């Protein structure tokens, strides 16, 4: 697309569609038949800091990359941070709506759907066939297991078991997804 940047380390599969004003930088691999909507940034440095002896925040190097599978759609104005040491991974057939954030070291499983405004903090695992409703916030380090579903605006602060529906602040289990 117009005004897009694809860095020299980026590896693109066949039939990748990149729309306008996209930035893809660092060690990024994108699979076949994947679409990246306008305004998205892939491979940005993650939000990781430590405090020095004087209490000043010092950036932690992010040496990993981003691996995006095949048949993925990344919506407009998404940000996907590269991993700290390991890669941030988005598996095949994942679909993200507009304005989603996927942080460093996250792993998103196959056929997972992220609706508008989802924010996933770092080092989080989202397994396969998960639905994250609009505005879902996921704290760092949790696991949302296969076939789980979050309600609109859910704040996920702990692991979500396979096939459960959670909602609320903080998110609580309501029922099985396929009752």
Range-by-range predicted roles:
Residues 1-167, 171-174:
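Structural signal for interior beta-strand "rungs" in well-ordered beta-sheet cores
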């Amino acid at each position: 697309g117009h005004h897009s940047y694809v860095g020299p380390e980026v590896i693109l599969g066949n039939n990748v569609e990149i729309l306008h004003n996209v930035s893809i930088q660092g060690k990024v691999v994108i699979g076949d038949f994947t679409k990246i909507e306008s305004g998205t940034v892939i491979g940005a440095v993650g939000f990781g800091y430590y405090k020095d002896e004087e209490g000043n925040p010092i950036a932690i190097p992010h040496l990993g990359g981003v691996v995006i599978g095949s048949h993925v759609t990344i919506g407009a104005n998404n940000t996907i941070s590269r991993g700290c040491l390991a890669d941030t991974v988005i598996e095949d057939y994942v679909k993200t709506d507009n304005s989603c954030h996927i942080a460093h070291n996250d792993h998103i499983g196959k056929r997972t759907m992220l609706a508008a405004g989802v924010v996933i903090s770092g080092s989080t695992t989202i397994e396969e066939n998960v639905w994250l409703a609009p505005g879902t916030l996921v704290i760092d380090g949790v696991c949302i297991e296969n076939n789980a579903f979050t309600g609109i605006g859910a704040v996920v602060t702990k692991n979500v078991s396979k096939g459960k529906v959670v909602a609320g602040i903080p998110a609580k289990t309501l029922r099985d997804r396929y009752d």
